Structure formats: C-alpha cells, structure tokens
Design a protein with these regions (language model features):
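Short beta-strand micro-motifs within the conserved protein kinase catalytic domain, predominantly
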Residues: 70-83
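Regulatory alphaC helix of protein kinase catalytic domains
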Residues: 53, 57-58
Length: 330
C-alpha cells in the first residue's frame, strides 16, 4: 500500500533541509503536476513536535484559500517513522529571499507591491482568524513563511506552530514563534490571541519596506527588551504616511489597541484591492462559463453538421435506389 502511494510521485530535486527532514520538489505521475513534499522523521521528535506536525496537517487540510499553501495529501511510513506532507509548489520562493535580492541590488520594493502583499497575507489571515470552527492562530508569521507562486501571488504556509482556539477560549499560552517577529505578550509569556499574528505581520511589512527587521539585537534578552519597548523608526520616507501609520498601528505594544483583520480589511487601500480581486475572480468564473457555453454550442454545431451530412448521404442513397428501380422496371 505504501509503495503504491509513494509511486504516485517522482522526486525531482531537494529544495531545503532541516533538523527533522527535508523539502523536495516532486512530480505527480498521473498528470505531471509539480508539487512539494515535506519529509519529516517523526521518530526523532518529542510529543510536542509530533503535535506540531498533526496540527499542520489538520489545519492545512481544512483551510481552502487562494492565499494559503494548498494541501494535497499525506503519506505515513510507519516502518521508517517518516511522514510526507504533499503541498502546493511555490516556484518564486519566499519573502525572505525577495528581501535579500532587494538588499543585494540596493532596490526598494514598490509601495504598490507592498500593499498587494499586505492584502493577500491579510486575506489568508482573515480566513484563519474568522474560521467557522474557531480562530486559527498562525503564531509564526515571518518572511520565510510567506511564499510566492509563479504569478507572484502570496501563499501563507508553514502552519506547524498553529493553534486553533475554540469560540469559548479567546487566549492561548506558550512561547512559540520566531523571536524577531514575536509579539511583546509572547515574549513575556503572557496570554495572547490573534492580535499576535497582526503584530508579526506588521513586523514583516516593516522589513519589506526597510529591508531589515524592526528590532535587531545581538542576544535574546536585548531583543526582548526592544520588542517590549516597541520603539521603531519610521519606514523609509519613500513610502507614504498612510502605510507607515498602518504598520505602526499593527505594532502597538498593547494588543488590545492593535487592529483586527476586520479593521485592516476596511482600510481604503486594502478594501479597494479586495474588491478588484473579487471582480477579477467573477470575471474569470464568467469567462469559464462562457467558454463552456461556447464549447457546448460548437459541439451542437458539429452534431448539426454531422446530421446534415448523414441526411445528404441518405438522400443520395435513396435517389440511387430509385434510379436503380426505374432501370430494372424498364
């Protein structure tokens, strides 16, 4: 059974490697579609780390959104204690790679692109925070967890640290995430909610504009003190006051004063992009419908032509038979 499942895919190349496994580009044999699989050795993990894997699989399986990395399948090899999580392939890498390229070339990312990325990550977060079965906290939003597909559309991924909160429970406890992007309440190991994701997204946007994290330090204690103070410089002056204000709002030290996904979605720069996207999606659906109708019309036309051809053939046959009858009768 395992061999049958594994034989559905052909490994192409290694993308990355970590402590517990690797990520490889693969090809689905049935249709040639390029995907990735995350190969993890759960035999080396403690119970907490195993829980992170189960959490990622369960959350990805339930989340269906154009700005969230799509989950396809999972294969478990109990003999070698490995799990293969099969997901969408994002060929243009992640935002950390984009930031590095911009730093090397001494070029800033245009404000329009920043707003586009902002809108798409926010759309993904909206799907998480407003999930019908309970809020899903990502808990590790950072540039390297935001991927780009072939058309530079944003895909939020790596839900290994995610946690679902029931509608009755509004807060989580535990120190998780990447230190540079952790919220003050996470640093202090206090209770936190979905507003921690908003802080982390604000940090990502700051880094996209400034090409460096908002808080930098040589040790964890110094970094923690800077994050808790929450003092950051303005983003480069080439960017608008509007964008700067929104980023600073997202990075408010008091989580109760930070915006929600709903607050951010109602901002003019965001709402207009969401509307434009909905119009494009509606147009794309309409075009598919039109193409289907056109295809059906063409098939009907082909059938009509075929019927006419057969009728003509039958008429000619009938005419020939009549002529033969007349000859024999004479």
């Amino acid at each position: 059974m395992l061999k049958i499942e594994m034989d559905k895919y052909e490994p192409i190349s290694l993308i990355g490697k970590g402590n517990f496994g690797s990520i490889s580009k693969i090809r689905r044999i049935s249709d040639g579609k390029i995907l990735v699989w995350k190969e993890l050795d759960y035999g080396k993990m403690d119970e907490k780390e195993k829980h992170h894997i189960v959490s990622e699989v369960n959350i990805l399986r339930d989340l269906h959104h154009p700005n969230i990395v799509k989950y396809y399948d999972r294969i478990i090899d109990k003999k070698s204690t490995k799990i293969y999580i099969i997901m969408e392939y994002c060929p243009r890498g992640d935002l950390s790679q984009l930031i590095k390229r911009c730093k090397r070339s001494h070029e800033y990312i245009s404000e329009d692109v920043i707003w586009k990325i902002f809108t798409q990550v926010l759309s993904a977060l909206y799907a998480c925070h407003m999930h019908k079965e309970g809020k899903i906290l990502h808990r590790d939003i950072k540039p390297s967890n935001v991927f780009l597909d072939n058309e530079n559309n944003v895909k939020l991924g790596d839900f290994g640290l995610s946690r679902m909160l029931s509608n009755e429970s509004n807060f989580a406890y535990s120190n998780v995430g990447t230190p540079y992007y952790m919220s003050p309440e996470q640093i202090d190991e206090n209770r936190y909610n979905e507003k921690s994701d908003i802080w982390s997204l604000g940090c990502c946007l700051y880094e996209l504009t400034s090409l460096r994290p908002p808080f930098e330090a040589t040790n964890h204690l110094s970094l923690a003190l800077k994050i808790k103070a929450g003092k950051v410089q303005r983003i480069p002056v080439k960017y608008s006051d509007e964008l700067n204000r929104v980023i600073m709002w997202m990075m408010t030290v008091n989580q109760d004063s930070r915006p929600s996904v709903e607050n951010l979605a109602s901002l003019p720069q965001i709402s207009i992009r969401i509307k434009e996207r909905k119009i494009k999606e509606s147009y794309a659906k309409l075009k598919i419908l039109e193409d289907n109708i056109r295809g059906r019309e063409e098939r009907v036309k082909e059938k009509e032509i075929e019927l006419e051809r057969r009728e003509k053939y039958l008429d000619e046959r009938e005419k020939m038979l009549k002529e033969k009858e007349e000859i024999f009768n004479n």
